[in-house]
């Protein structure tokens, strides 16, 4: 039974696979997704900090937090959702935790995350 379920999940992942950039919690993301309203369908952009990432096969998801008009908004997106159009990494963040739920309580400068810098090693002659 579980083997059949695993095969089904693998088929669905292959069918719904999208090109997704590599990102981690702490990164600034720009998520584009479709919203269905009473008037029709429109595209919305949600830009904020990734506070968690959950890798569970077909049920993989990630949470993004942004501050709008002084209120903290956390939105969860499913990786294999047909409503998800694209994800862009705007900035890499330097954090030492996998889940950044403590950021939901912080505002302003306290909620800032340092940028992760990568260095290129020069070849010696």
Swiss-Prot record:
Protein's UniProt name: Large ribosomal subunit protein bL19
GO-annotated cellular components: cytosolic large ribosomal subunit
Gene3D superfamilies, alphabetized: 2.30.30.790
GO molecular function, one term: structural constituent of ribosome
Record's function text: This protein is located at the 30S-50S ribosomal subunit interface and may play a role in the structure and function of the aminoacyl-tRNA binding site.
Organism of derivation: Wolbachia pipientis subsp. Culex pipiens (strain wPip)
Keyword match Ribonucleoprotein: yes
Biological processes annotated in GO: translation
Family: Belongs to the bacterial ribosomal protein bL19 family.
Keyword annotations of the record: Ribonucleoprotein, Ribosomal protein
Iron-sulfur in keyword set: no
Pfam families in UniProt: Ribosomal_L19
Top-level taxon of origin: Bacteria
Family matches, as SUPFAM superfamilies: Translation proteins SH3-like domain
Gene that produces this protein: rplS
């Amino acid at each position: 039974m579980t083997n059949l379920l695993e095969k089904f999940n693998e088929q669905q992942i292959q069918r719904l696979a999208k090109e997704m950039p590599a990102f981690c919690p702490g990164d600034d993301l720009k998520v584009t997704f479709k919203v269905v309203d009473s008037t029709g369908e429109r595209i919305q952009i949600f830009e904020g900090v990734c506070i968690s990432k959950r890798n569970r096969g077909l049920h993989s998801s990630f949470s993004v937090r942004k501050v709008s008009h002084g209120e903290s908004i956390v939105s969860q997106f499913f990786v294999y959702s047909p409503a998800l159009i694209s994800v862009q990494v705007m900035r890499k963040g330097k954090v030492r935790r996998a889940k950044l739920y403590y950021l939901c309580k912080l505002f302003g400068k306290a909620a800032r995350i340092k940028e992760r810098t990568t260095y290129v090693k020069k070849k010696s002659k």
